[in-house]
UniProtKB/Swiss-Prot annotation:
This is Protein virB9. Keywords: Cell membrane, Crown gall tumor, Disulfide bond, Membrane, Plasmid, Signal, Virulence. It is found in: Cell membrane. The keyword Signal applies. Gene3D superfamilies: 2.60.40.2500. Heterodimer of virB7 and virB9; disulfide-linked.
């Protein structure tokens, strides 16, 4: 094979390779002049228009065209408007490069086009290679947006589940310890003193003591009676008409001004019990996040 034949073959191969490297937008189903393609930063996009006809390229809605570099500004007008770029050729153009830069919140993008134009007697949709509109799609961006939305939904769902769990735990803690029932609770209490302070019920489950008062009375101050007979302020919480104390004592003293009432635990166990739940209640178990088992 002669050197001239090798040169011609190499040129033909280069031309074929270059043609394959260009990305031709896909024709629309209703009108082939409407074209669509997915963005690929490594591809040259082919644009084909007619002399005197306007061609618009549409980029992502969050992009703004910032720079346009054309090879022949005399015969090819380029007008950017937001995420749109309009072209209009005044003369026949052989394929020539156009470089476009866009900016968005996520950064800058580069687009490389190869645009050409030809003279056409009419501009109907039967004309081959006549583009009126080229619109980009962004599958990678859409997939990333779906992933972000899924992650955000997962976070919202997790926070919602945690809030529900927290509300259930708070509701449970706000309830008096009556879930064990009468057979498991100690009701053996006797009162001594001013009965105007007398609660309707007093009971314990071995861990917590509950005083149940009428709903419209003022709740007195409650003190535990130590073995030496001295008083100590009881740490209690008021839940509606119930007062819950996270301990059991042999005796309690209720005071409201000079009015005093003593309540004695007739079945008091000085050894006591442990709930084995990590809390002061047998019906509320402490669970550490991330703990096994």
């Amino acid at each position: 094979m002669t050197r001239k034949a090798l040169f011609i073959l190499a040129c033909l191969f280069a031309a074929a390779t270059g043609a394959e490297a260009e990305d031709t937008p896909m024709a629309g189903k209703l009108d082939p002049r409407m074209r669509y393609l997915a963005y690929n930063p490594d591809q040259v996009v082919r644009l084909s228009t007619a002399v005197g006809a306007t061609l618009v390229v549409t980029f992502a809605t969050n992009e703004t065209v910032t720079s346009v570099a054309v090879s022949n500004s005399k015969d090819l007008a380029a007008l950017p408007r937001g995420n749109y770029l309009f072209f209009k050729a005044s003369q026949v153009l052989t394929p020539q490069p156009v470089i476009v830069l866009t900016a968005s919140d996520s950064g800058m993008r580069r687009y490389v086009f190869s645009i050409s134009s030809k003279t056409l007697s009419h501009l109907d949709k039967e004309q081959p290679d006549l583009y009126y509109s080229v619109q980009f799609a962004y599958p990678a961006d859409d997939a990333a947006a779906r992933r972000r939305e899924a992650q955000q939904r997962a976070v919202v769902d997790r926070l919602h589940a945690e809030a529900q769990y927290q509300r259930k735990a708070e509701d449970l803690l706000d309830q008096p310890v009556t879930a064990l029932g009468a057979t498991d609770s100690n009701w053996h209490y006797v009162a001594q003193g001013d009965r105007s302070l007398l609660p309707l019920e007093v009971f314990d489950n071995g861990f917590t003591t509950v005083f149940h008062f009428p709903g419209n009375v003022r709740i007195p101050s409650i003190y535990t009676i130590n073995p030496d007979g001295k008083e100590a302020v009881a740490n209690y919480s008021v839940k509606g008409s119930d007062v819950e104390i996270s301990s059991v004592s042999r005796g309690w003293r209720l005071r409201d001004g000079h009015t005093v009432l003593c309540i004695w635990n007739a079945a008091y166990d000085p050894v006591g019990q442990r709930p084995q739940t990590g809390t002061v209640r047998p019906d509320v178990k402490r669970v550490l996040k991330g703990a096994k088992g």
